[in-house]
Design a protein with these regions (language model features):
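Conserved donor-binding/catalytic loop of nucleotide-activated donor transferases
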Residues: 115, 255-258, 273-282, 301
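Active-site-proximal region of nucleotide-activated glycan assembly enzymes
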Residues: 113-175
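C-terminal alpha-helical cap of glycosyltransferases
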Residues: 343-363
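Donor-nucleotide binding loops and adjacent catalytic segments primarily
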Residues: 42, 47-49, 170-179, 183-262, ...
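A short, well-ordered alpha-helix in the C-terminal region of glycosyltransferases
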Residues: 330-344
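Conserved nucleotide-sugar phosphate-binding/catalytic loop shared by glycosyltransferases and other
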Residues: 2-12, 31-82, 310
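Short amphipathic alpha-helix
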Residues: 14-26
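Glycosyltransferases and closely related glycan-assembly transferases
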Residues: 84-97, 105-120, 133-137, 141
Length: 363
C-alpha cells in the first residue's frame, strides 16, 4: 500500500477518528501517502491541515430524512460531488479509500466503487448514519465502535482516538493537570465539557448551580465552547471555578478531574470511559437518539449516569453532583467499571482492516 484516501469531516465526531487512523497508518507505514477528503464547511478545514495532512475539498451532500426541498435537490448535488471526488481519486491514485461517515462520505463511497477501489467504512456511533448504511452495502470491510451497531459485515474495532488519550495515566498526571488549569491540588474536581462546539444546556445548568458546588468544596473546570457564555461569581476563598473556551490538552483536563459532565458523542464516550473517568452523560436531544445509545454500554456497566437533556436542570445538578463528587468510594467504583468498557486501540484495529482491504484488492 502506497497511498490512502481518508474521507470524513463536518464535526469532530468524524474528523477526530480520521486523524487518529491517519496517525496509526503513518506509524506503521512511514512512507505512506495519506490524503484526506472533506468539505469546505466542516472542522476538517482547520484540524486536518493543522495535523499535517493534505486535504482535498468537494461539495457536501446533506442527506435529508424529510420529504422537503433539500431531499429533491439531493440527486443533483450528489452527481456533482461524485464527479468532484472522481477527479480527486484520479489525481491521488489511492490504493484504498476509508470513509468515516458524514456529508463527504457518500460521494467518496460511490466514487471508490466506480473506480473499483477497495473501500473501508467506519461507523463511529452506536446507531449507524445514512451514509454508512449505504457504504456498508458496497464493501466487506466494515468497522464499528459499539457492539450493538447493526451493519452488514461489521467487525468491532472500537473508535480510533488520540494516542495521548489512549495512553493516559490519570493519577500520574493529576497534579500537572490541576496546576495547568490553576486548580487546587487537593479539592474534588468536576470537568464540564460540551465537546468541540460547547453545550448551552450544560453551560447554563452547571454554572447556575455553582453555589451548591462551592458549598460542597467542589472546584470546576468548565470548557464552554467557542460561543458559550457563563456568568459565575468567584467566591472569595472558595473553590476555583475555571472557565475555558477551548482546551487543547484534554489529557490534562481528564487527569485533573474526578468526574465529568458531558454530552455523549462517540469520541467523548470512548475517551472518558477509556481513561476511567466517571461521567454524567447528557445526550444531545436531536437525531435518532444515537448519543443515548452511545452512552448505554458505559452506564449499564456502572461507569456513568444518563440524564435526559430536559431533566438536566440546575436543581438536578444541586441535588446530585455535589454528593457524587463527595463520595470517593462511589467514584472509584465508577472509574473501575468505566475503564473496561471501550477498546482503546481502535486506531490500530482499524489500521489492520485498512491493510487487509488494500491487500485484497477491490472490495
Amino acid at each position: 500500500m502506497r497511498r490512502v484516501l481518508l474521507a470524513g469531516g463536518g464535526t469532530a465526531g468524524h474528523t477526530s477518528p480520521l486523524l487518529a487512523t491517519a496517525d496509526a497508518l503513518r506509524r506503521r507505514h512511514p512512507s505512506l501517502e495519506i490524503t484526506c477528503l472533506g468539505t469546505p464547511r466542516g472542522l476538517e478545514t482547520t484540524l486536518i491541515p493543522a495535523a499535517g495532512y493534505p486535504l482535498e475539498l468537494v461539495s457536501p451532500v446533506p442527506l435529508s430524512r424529510a420529504l422537503d426541498a433539500d431531499l429533491l435537490r439531493t440527486p443533483g448535488r450528489l452527481r456533482a460531488s461524485v464527479r468532484e471526488t472522481l477527479a480527486v481519486l484520479d489525481r491521488v491514485q489511492p490504493d484504498v479509500v476509508v470513509g468515516f461517515g458524514g456529508y463527504v462520505s457518500v460521494p467518496a463511497y460511490l466514487a471508490a466503487r466506480r473506480r473499483h477501489l477497495p473501500l473501508v467504512v467506519h461507523e463511529g456511533n452506536a446507531l449507524a448514519g445514512i451514509a454508512n448504511k449505504l457504504g456498508a452495502r458496497l464493501t466487506r470491510h466494515v468497522a464499528t465502535s459499539f457492539p450493538a451497531t447493526r451493519l452488514p459485515h461489521a467487525v468491532l474495532t472500537g473508535l480510533p482516538i488520540r494516542r495521548m488519550i489512549a495512553t493516559l495515566d490519570r493519577p500520574a498526571l493529576r497534579s500537572e493537570g490541576r496546576v495547568a488549569f490553576g486548580l487546587d491540588p487537593d479539592l474534588p474536581t468536576l470537568l464540564v465539557t460540551g465537546g468541540s462546539q460547547g453545550a448551552l444546556r450544560l453551560n447554563g445548568s452547571v454554572s447556575a448551580a455553582a453555589d451548591a458546588l462551592a458549598d460542597a468544596g467542589v472546584q470546576v473546570l468548565h470548557v464552554i465552547g467557542p460561543k458559550g457564555e457563563v456568568q459565575v461569581e468567584q467566591r472569595p476563598g472558595g473553590p476555583p471555578y475555571v472557565v475555558e473556551r477551548y482546551v487543547d490538552r484534554m489529557d490534562l483536563a481528564y487527569a485533573a478531574a474526578d468526574a465529568v459532565v458531558c454530552r455523549a458523542g462517540s469520541n467523548t464516550v470512548t475517551e472518558v470511559a477509556g481513561v476511567g473517568l466517571p461521567a454524567v452523560f447528557v445526550p444531545l436531544p436531536i437525531g435518532n437518539g444515537e448519543q443515548a445509545l452511545n452512552a448505554r454500554p458505559v452506564v449499564d456497566a456502572g461507569g456513568g449516569l444518563l440524564v435526559a437533556d430536559a431533566a438536566f436542570t440546575p436543581e438536578w445538578v444541586r441535588a446530585h453532583v455535589p454528593a457524587l463528587l463527595g463520595d470517593p468510594e462511589r467514584l472509584a467504583a465508577m472509574a473501575r467499571a468505566a475503564a473496561g468498557v471501550m477498546p482503546l486501540d481502535g486506531d490500530e484495529r482499524l489500521a489492520d482492516l485498512v491493510d487487509l482491504a488494500a491487500g485484497e484488492g477491490v472490495r
